């Protein structure tokens, strides 16, 4: 960053004390305080992994991503703050040590001369705190909501999962991973929107949804995947109504996929290069209902490996068979199936951050990961990944009561209101439990 840019940053500099969150990352923290918060997070991660599906090994690369929502994106690694797209060094320090605290959205650095510096993100911006002042990084001043999830057994893990969703919101819209995907996917976008509806962040994707005009995202080799039709209608329902111009186009596409079966009319076509009539029809019905449109379709009684991926409703319309539940390369499949059945057998990453990933996807540009670390590009492994983060978040956020009390059935608020790509403010927002308050924001 040149001198002119840093002059602009200096104009945004503010005294440190008035803007600090009560218990967030600060350059004034003693090293033991930062280590204590990191230890609490790690203890929570251990419990989480024991209760759910353990871990999968991710590369031993310590980094943290800054730039949630529409903000400019940055990578922190080893005393350097990098532009996440170009790899250009924005700031660097000669450090003796650093502590990355993912649930606090921050990093505390100690320099060779004993100065403590913090890079921290909050509901207002990304800040660099040093020498008693903090400066908002240019391009990051945009509001968003960061619930603390206080009272939830896994409040820290939920904060990190939420961050992994928010950091992948781009000017183009919500993407699975901003390094390897330049365009939004309707399926991943719909799952992200379900999570953002819980946390009051739908405004971050509102303009993207309002601007949708195509019934399909055509991201899988240009294919017209019929599950997109229901996903598109559901997305529209979150910010508009049946008069949105995309709705008529979606309805006009339905006849080409319709078939008649013993249970009635349903749709079928190829999603992820295979037919998934149960999954596709469930999404269609979900989208129609979300917009209050007539529904003349019935979920067919057919075996469908994707049936259990749709856990939001119509659970009784399911024929047992072989589920598509790859928990290694496409862990969002396993998490969705676990949500459907109420099982707990899907993993998160073995590192502090990131917790989610996807590997060997056919449409991902893995070469773009070299800016993060060449090992991610070599392994064709993108992390974090929003479908994985959304499935995990939506299962966990309402699966457990606050500390103590009886376990309740999952109550994720995913009922409407009225996939893999493989060739097969400084004050944080409070978070009332979802079983007590149906929707946030």
Residue ranges and their predicted role:
Residues 158-180, 207-226, 254-277, 296-335, ...:
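Glycine- and aromatic-rich loop/turn segments at beta-sheet edges
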Residues 24-184:
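Low-complexity, Ser/Thr/Pro/Gly-enriched N-terminal "stalk/linker" regions
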Residues 8-18:
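Bacterial N-terminal signal peptides
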Residues 1-7:
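Bacterial N-terminal signal peptides that target proteins for export
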Residues 138-148, 182, 188-201, 231-245, ...:
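Well-ordered alpha-helical scaffold segments within catalytic/enzyme domains
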Residues 183-190, 196-294:
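Aromatic-rich carbohydrate-recognition surfaces in CAZymes
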Residues 25-62, 68, 300-418, 422, ...:
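Non-catalytic carbohydrate-binding regions of carbohydrate-active enzymes
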């Amino acid at each position: 960053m040149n001198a002119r840019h840093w002059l602009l940053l200096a104009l945004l500099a503010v005294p440190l004390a008035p803007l600090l969150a009560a218990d967030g990352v600060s350059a004034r923290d003693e090293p033991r305080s930062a280590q204590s918060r990191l230890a609490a997070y790690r203890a929570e991660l251990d419990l989480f992994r024991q209760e759910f599906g353990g871990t999968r090994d991710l590369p031993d690369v310590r980094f943290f991503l800054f730039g949630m929502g529409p903000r400019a994106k940055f990578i922190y690694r080893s005393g350097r703050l990098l532009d996440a797209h170009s790899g250009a060094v924005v700031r660097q320090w000669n450090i003796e040590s650093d502590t990355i605290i993912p649930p606090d959205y921050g990093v505390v650095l100690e320099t060779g001369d004993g100065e403590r510096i913090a890079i921290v993100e909050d509901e207002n911006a990304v800040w660099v705190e040093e020498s008693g002042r903090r400066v908002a990084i240019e391009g990051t001043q945009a509001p968003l909501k960061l619930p603390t999830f206080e009272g939830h057994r896994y409040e820290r893990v939920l904060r990190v999962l939420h961050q992994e969703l928010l950091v992948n919101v781009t000017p183009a819209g919500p993407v699975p991973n901003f390094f390897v995907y330049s365009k939004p996917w309707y399926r991943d976008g719909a799952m992200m929107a379900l999570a953002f509806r819980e946390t009051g962040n739908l405004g971050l994707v509102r303009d993207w949804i309002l601007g949708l005009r195509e019934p399909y995202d055509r991201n899988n080799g240009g294919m017209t995947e019929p599950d997109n039709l229901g996903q598109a209608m559901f997305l529209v329902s979150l910010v508009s109504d049946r008069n949105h111009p995309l709705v008529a186009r979606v309805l006009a596409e339905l006849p080409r996929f319709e078939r008649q079966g013993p249970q009635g009319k349903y749709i079928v076509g190829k999603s992820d290069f295979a037919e998934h009539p149960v999954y596709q029809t469930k999404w269609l019905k979900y989208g129609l209902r979300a917009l209050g449109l007539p529904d003349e379709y019935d979920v067919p009684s057919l075996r469908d490996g994707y049936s259990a991926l749709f856990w939001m409703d119509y659970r009784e319309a399911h024929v047992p068979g072989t589920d598509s539940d790859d928990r290694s390369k496409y862990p969002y499949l396993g998490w969705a199936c676990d949500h459907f059945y109420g099982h707990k057998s899907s993993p998160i990453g073995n590192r502090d951050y990131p917790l989610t990933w996807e590997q060997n996807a056919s449409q991902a540009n893995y070469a773009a990961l070299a800016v993060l670390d060449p090992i991610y590009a070599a392994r064709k492994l993108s992390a974090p990944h929003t479908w994985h983060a959304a499935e995990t978040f939506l299962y966990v956020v309402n699966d457990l009561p606050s500390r103590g009390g009886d376990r309740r059935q999952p109550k994720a608020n995913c009922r409407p209101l009225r996939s893999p790509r493989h060739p097969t403010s400084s004050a944080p927002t409070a978070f009332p439990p979802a079983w007590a308050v149906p929707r946030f924001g």
